[in-house]
């Protein structure tokens, strides 16, 4: 069916560029240019900000299903005007779509790959049907449950640049049948492949030599991998499924995987972008996964085994230099092997680093001592309260049994509770910036709601996702720079104090937070605006209202664009040095040096340059300003509870930082907020004690001295140097406060 296309004309864009100055943070333009500006081959340069915003907004507005066929003049005018407002909102940096949308929306890759606009996903690790999906193994019926399916889903989404949360709780793992077969795996490669020698070193064998020794293939399953994402996934699926009789119809136990056609290291990846890792990481992954499952022949896989398989997949995906896989493993709270699995340092450094690990709890759970102890040792596990997620939206709206009953887990950063196969779908508004730029906040949040709703009309690759998205239409409208906004509008932080109280169930004495009533009204009114907008738009489109609507995402890279505090987090310090790592060949480096930024070789990675940016937080000199280094653990818990109570009906992503003298408060505070906080994680506050730390707190005098050395605007100098070329790629840059989500 043909469709009408909404486009923004150049005269309008030129007018907006004349009227609105983007609210770049001190790191904003540099972060944008190296992370979200796509290469324009026809112009031999990367995008400028107005071109990125045009691409992104048009890519989104044209998802409105009413544009299929012959839409009315009224619909065309409505969406054209909406596109213009969204352009103004985003160009000025009063709000932005998720980083994933900034990178992918409006590209050919979006049109080809329906999943590409969603940052993160969730899958339950249990046998599942492939169904009507873009990947279905040929050796089984699409309606047959296969152990490989959730691993295939995870592998596919990670390679498309998404993060994946996965559940290995006991109720899922016990559905996996006993391992029937030990598989004899051989990975072969042709001498003509450029990757031949490197692949042999990691365990592959020469194809000609193997053929000589194995002239008879009757008892062998032979699979020659095509040079595609799907080929990698299907090879791994075959390897996993051969271990189980019900998905091994040939009852063969020898598997040969031929990797001769896989492009070599450094070759270009079309679509998502970047360069290939070559087949070597894949060879290692196949061998390692086979060893994990072979070790359980006659027994059941454990939660640790399943997590290892997911981590090995994640490690392989990370080997490509663009995709940064984020994983969250959710285990049972009484599974001590799972909770302690990262204490095996050899396996931690080999692959177990690839996921952040959390445990599933309910509000009756009370054994927080071991969890607090684990957090003190290695910052894990985080906690996810599935009971609250299934039966509550905002806490203030009370118990609503089964309101979100399909929830089984969360995305890697923990701000969206998700059902099996479901993605998060994010857009964030910067209320502090939006107010400064004259926006009515309710209008800004209405535009955000409609943007996110349209993403649910993408063509999704997996049947499990299509079904749950059509049912739930879940969106995640977030706000960032929350501390800046509250401090600006209230004149102080939202937690004004604590009062003595008693926990009604346990009888323990607690300190109950006191919130500024105006702060409550501020977020409550915006929540109601989102609900109203979703209801109206859903009626227009003839679809279900979204099951949940609001969240607080950790932000990070996107918050840097506007220079605001990240999500609900407090600024790391009032004044700080932010260090960002660039590849030594990055064309931004000469401009940064000419502007006076301090640069030096990175002490951890070859061919990498560390650049220091002096930053000042909004309101850094206010007597009511607090940073992550000065705010108490109690106030951070209370602030997260405030947002979960009055703003977010999904969840609130938060990494609470604590000082060494607050260690004993972790377990009591987790217990106190068990009826309020849906997910949280904690990390010790380091305060820049590491050499070349990403963030190093400094005093005002040092900031002023460093800032005085910066003589020019990087964007202007870069343009003058006219050295705009490819290669603007992040090195070791994590997106959110806890480092869980480096997803673009």
From Swiss-Prot:
Annotated stretches, region: Adenosylcobalamin-binding-1: 570-631
Activity regulation note: Allosterically regulated by ATP and dNTP.
Segments of this protein annotated with the region Effector region-1: 148-159
Entry's family note: Belongs to the class II ribonucleoside-triphosphate reductase family.
InterPro entries: RdRp_reductase_class-2, RNR-II_ins_dom, RNR_alpha_hel, RTP_Rdtase_AdoCbl-dep
Gene transcribed to yield this protein: rtpR
GO biological process: DNA replication
Region Adenosylcobalamin-binding-2, annotated ranges: 690-729
Molecular-function annotations in GO: cobalamin binding; nucleotide binding; ribonucleoside-diphosphate reductase activity, thioredoxin disulfide as acceptor; ribonucleoside-triphosphate reductase (thioredoxin) activity
Catalytic activity, as annotated: a 2'-deoxyribonucleoside 5'-triphosphate + [thioredoxin]-disulfide + H2O = a ribonucleoside 5'-triphosphate + [thioredoxin]-dithiol
Protein name: Adenosylcobalamin-dependent ribonucleoside-triphosphate reductase
